[in-house]
Amino acid sequence: MKTSVRIGAFEIDDGELHGESPGDRTLTIPCKSDPDLCMQLDAWDAETSIPALLNGEHSVLYRTRYDQQSDAWIMRLA
């Protein structure tokens, strides 16, 4: 599902939310949307909690992995 994502000053509108149940939900952030955001995500580690707004709702994200094939970060929702 297309998702609007805001992390700090960064805002994209083509994130992809996957999964239904808590603990199973992930967010894909394509690097083509905002290369500066992707560089910032690369600087954080997997334990860093990242406050975000997803479609206007407060969430906390954790970096899972970078998917080289799709050039996107995969994040898990807390």
Swiss-Prot record:
It holds the Pfam family DUF1480. InterPro entries: DUF1480 (IPR009950). This is Uncharacterized protein YebV. It comes from Escherichia coli (strain K12). The gene is yebV.
